[in-house]
């Protein structure tokens, strides 16, 4: 009987000890979370979530109008929630910690890209094999690779510092940038390859690249253009460029290569100033309007006013990203912010340019608005990376903080 009482006392003591430790840990977590909320950039997430809510509204209206099915809309909503939560989690982690672990992210991104060469796993559209089929879901690896590319390239350039203008080091940085571009080009996704190129150029410039290399690069543009036009681009790529300036070709390709852009331009203008609303019977059919041509749908339903509101929102987002870059505490943080800015800016300008028929159709989605789960998720996660650079300026004790940090 005495032994039983002893065991009871020991268990009771251990239970109270556990409760005490639990209370201490909870207090510590709440304190750190309060510190996080104090330092975190609240404006950037609000902008992104506001645009996302607007997108969900658009997607639901497309379901009501029979443009997409309910399952597609549900996938987009789930992707938005996962992206927002993922972005929040990334923002909790110090961006310097993410930089140190680049060697774990890079192989994952590479494996996902290489899986596109497995015929049974990929979805091939024309010559573009940019999507993986994983059970009931599709995944676009290049969107994940953009996030990893920004982290790895920022880490590489920040570690070099002034050595970036040393030719051997610059050549290694060039290999770092050209490898994912080349891999994605082989897979037929020229649009994503151009996004990587723009990110690469902007981050190089931010990294302190010498003007002599910049001038040399600009002088080589005609030669690079000639080689790309004659030896890299395929016939359908060249046709998309030529069709913008050739009225006769536009008529010939009205039901083929020029169909989406032609119908998208008509849909965009049909809304005039205030749009046709969400219950009109006079919608203009545009192939895949929910994807790369969602800006046409906005113009058709909400008119010029709706389009300008979207342009202003994206412009404010880009300016906020640049502001965060200027306020980042070190070169690594600045490079990460500039990389995300370059991605959002290029996506926005090229996508709207495609709809306005001033840029060829190259399959680049409009940030936070085009239907596409992977793009939606990774956009929010990239924003979480930018937020991390602002809320970890000081030694903020975040959730993953240790005394060794």
Task: Describe each model-derived feature in a short phrase.
Residues 305-348:
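Hydrophobic transmembrane alpha-helices and their immediate junctions
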